[in-house]
Amino acid sequence: MSRQKKVLAIVLAGGEGKRLMPLTEDRAKPAVPFAGGYRLIDFALSNLVNSGYLQIVVLTQYKSHSLDRHLSETWRLSTQLGNYVTSVPAQQRRGKDWFLGSANAIYQSMNLIDDADPDIVVVVGADHVYRMDFADMVEKHIESGAKATVAGVRQPMEMVKSFGVIETDPQDPAKITRFVEKPDTTAPLPDDPHSFLASMGNYVFDRDALVEALRTDNEKADTDHDMGGDIMPYFAERGEAVVYDFTHNDVPGSTDRDRQYWRDVGTLESYFDSHMDLIRPLPVFNLYNYDWPIYTHQIMAPPARTVRGPNGQAGVAFDSIVSPGVLITGGHVGSSVLSPKVKVEHDARVTESVLMQNVQIGAGATVHRCILDKNVVVPPGTTVGLDREQDLARGLTVTESGLTIAPKNYRFER
C-alpha cells in the first residue's frame, strides 16, 4: 500500500481589499464580516477542514488584528494530533521587505514548508464565498502527473478583465496552454461562446516544483511576485499545469441549485449581491448544509426577538437573516441581513440592506439598499439610501449602482 500524500494548506490572507473600502478601512479583506456571523476567511478554512486538511498556515499582513483575533478565537484544532491553523505575519525572513505579492509571501515563509515537509501544497485565497472539496482536486492533481493545478470556474465573457484567465489545449481540455491575469479579451469556451474559464485562486502544487518556481521568481527582476500573474504562467509555459474544472466538484449535501456556487466578493456590489443570494426564498447558496458546515465563532448573545412597539405595531422580519441578539421592536425588516446585536426600533423600515454587528436603527428611520458597518447609529427619523446627494454630503460612500455604505462607528448628525 502506497503512503498517503502529506498535504500542507497555505491560505493567502494579506489582501488589502481596496475595492471594498470603507469596509476594509480598519480590517483585512478576509476579516470582513459576512452573512451575519461569519468572516470571509471562514469559507476557505471550512472547506479545507471539511476536506480533511488540518495543517493550515494563514499568511497575514494588512491590518490583521481583527483577523488574528478571529483565528485565535475560532480555529483551534487539536495540536496533540499535529493539527493546527496558524496565523503567520510577514517576518522579513529573507530580507528587509514585507510581502511583495502573493508568491513572495510564500517564498518568505518557505520555512513553514520546510518544517511541515509536505508532498503536496494547497494554496487558497481567503476572500471568496463557496463550498469545495479540496480532496477531490488534490486527487485529480496527483492522477494528472502535473506539477501545478488551478481550479477554474466558468464566468461570462464580460467579466474577463476581472479574473485570471485559463486557456487550454482543444485536444486536451485539462492542459493549460496560457494563463494570464485580467486580459482585455480571451477566446470563449468551445462549448459555450458566452463564457471563459476563470481562475478561482485555488492551487495544488507538488512541493518541490513549487519551491523551485518560487526561487526562480524571486531571482527575476521583471515580476510582480504574484501566484496568478507569475507562478502559474511559469508552469503553463513549461507544459506542467492543468486545470481542475469546478463543475466536477461535488460536496455532501449540495443540491442542483447551489452546487458549484462561487462568488468573488472583491467589490461592494458583489459583496452586496452575495448577501442577497442568501435570502432568496430558494437561495442559490445554502448556509444550512449541515453535511458541509461553514464554521465560525459563535457570539455569546440571547436569541433574536421580535416584539410589538409602543403603538402596538408588530416587529416583522421577512426574507431575511436575523442573527442572535437582534431586537426588532415594532420595526419592519425585509430582504436584509441583520448581524448580531442589531436593534430596529418602532416604525423603522430596513429593506435590501446588510447591517453589521451592533448597528442601531432609530424609531421611524428608513434604510434602503445600504451596507452599515459595525456600531453605526441611525438616529430616529433619518433616511439613508434614498437620496444620493444627501448621502454623499454626509461623507458616505455611494456606488454607481446606488448602494450606500456607512463605515465602522459612523454617527449621523441629528
Curated annotation (Swiss-Prot):
GO molecular function (one): ATP binding
Uppermost EC category: transferase
Recorded superkingdom: Bacteria
Keywords for this protein: ATP-binding, Carbohydrate metabolism, Glycogen biosynthesis, Glycogen metabolism, Nucleotide-binding, Nucleotidyltransferase, Transferase
GO terms for biological process, alphabetical: glycogen biosynthetic process
InterPro entries given in the database record: ADP-Glc_PPase, ADP_Glu_pyroP_CS, GlgC_bac, GlmU/GlgC-like_hexapep, NTP_transferase_dom, Nucleotide-diphossugar_trans, Trimer_LpxA-like_sf
Chemical reaction(s) catalysed: alpha-D-glucose 1-phosphate + ATP + H(+) = ADP-alpha-D-glucose + diphosphate
Pathway: Glycan biosynthesis; glycogen biosynthesis
Coiled-coil region list: none
Subunit structure as annotated in this protein's UniProt entry: Homotetramer.
Protein name listed in UniProt: Glucose-1-phosphate adenylyltransferase
Species assigned in the record: Kocuria rhizophila (strain ATCC 9341 / DSM 348 / NBRC 103217 / DC2201)
Gene (name only): glgC
